[in-house]
A protein has these predicted regions:
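Canonical Radical SAM [4Fe-4S] cluster-binding loop centered on the CxxxCxxC motif
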Residues: 1-24
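A short, flexible beta-alpha/helix-coil linker loop
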Residues: 11-15, 112, 180-183
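Radical SAM/AdoMet-radical enzyme domain recognition
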Residues: 28-47, 56-178
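Flexible mid-to-C-terminal extensions adjoining Fe-S/redox cofactors in radical SAM and related proteins
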Residues: 260-281
């Protein structure tokens, strides 16, 4: 796919060397060993995102999961993967179900917006194929969340977004604000604060009405605001005005503090030679 606002293409274009190859066995093995070394009873979450992680092929994931199972002691392991949904077929769905993966699928809500923002490499529409993958995952009992990029175009139509949520019986959805590129040049997709607040105010009214009718939809921002109101720590990164601790490992082994800052100047190490403790910020 060739998403028109692709953040990862922007990041890669600002690095000295674009990281476009599939992760090798040496890097995958190092990630597993470093993570399991944190503690014998730790809860470890492996989350895969891209680009598009399914381009690595199903054999890559079979191998990764098998290695974790061989090497772990008493650690609890959870799995997640963010995908554009384009390649999801029966074998993928069965694999995700078998290993309890939480799958996030990128869908920009209603059909015409999605197809204009998220075409394939030839410029053709992808909505029908992606939603077919979403339905297959559900039918196979895989936990699915929807992720939508909140562009200025989407922000103008909260009613259409909520109609999509109801029509497709979406139970969990989150919206990622579309920000200007790293050169800080505003484009036609990026969001301004006024559009952001207007969208969420109207969306809240629609969500609240649905809740009053006994139908609950998990909208990530609303849940995090409620968590904070109850004195709990939010799960959404940045809600407290600072970054949550995490490590992002690129396919070449480079370690970064966040996928938004996977740039040369923020590279903190190489997973093949540095321990996680040594790289803790």
């Amino acid at each position: 796919m060739r998403c028109r606002y692709c953040f990862y293409c922007d990041v890669a274009a600002h690095r000295e060397e674009r990281s476009a190859r599939v992760m090798g066995e040496d890097v995958a093995s190092a990630i597993i060993d470093r993570a399991l070394a944190v503690a014998s009873d730790a809860h470890i979450s492996f989350a895969f995102q891209g680009g598009e992680p399914t381009l690595a092929g199903l054999d890559f994931f079979h191998s990764f999961v098998a290695r974790v199972e061989e090497r772990r002691e008493n650690q609890r392991v959870s799995w997640a993967l963010q995908t554009n949904g384009y390649l999801i077929e029966e074998e993928w769905a069965e694999f995700f179900r078998e290993h309890g993966f939480l799958i996030g699928v990128s869908v920009d809500a209603y059909r015409d917006l999605h197809d204009s923002m998220r075409p394939d490499a030839h410029g053709a529409a992808t909505y029908a194929r992606v939603m077919s993958g979403v339905r297959l995952l559900r039918e196979r009992g895989v936990d699915v969340n929807i992720l939508s990029v909140l562009t200025s175009q989407m922000a103008a139509h909260p009613q259409r977004v909520f109609s999509f949520i109801k029509q497709e019986k979406i139970t969990h959805i989150q919206f990622i604000p579309c920000l200007p590129g790293l050169d800080d040049e505003r484009d036609t997709f990026s969001l301004d604060p006024r559009a952001f607040s207007s969208f969420y105010r109207r969306l809240f009214d629609l969500w609240w009405r649905e809740l009053g009718a006994g139908r609950y939809v998990s909208i990530w921002l609303f849940e995090n605001v409620m968590q904070m109101a109850l004195g709990q720590f939010p799960s959404q990164c940045g809600m407290l005005g600072r970054c949550a601790p995490q490590f992002v490992v690129e396919s070449d082994g480079s370690v970064y503090p966040c996928d938004f800052y996977a740039l040369d100047e923020y590279r903190v190490g190489d997973i093949r030679v540095d321990s996680l403790e040594a790289r803790r910020l």
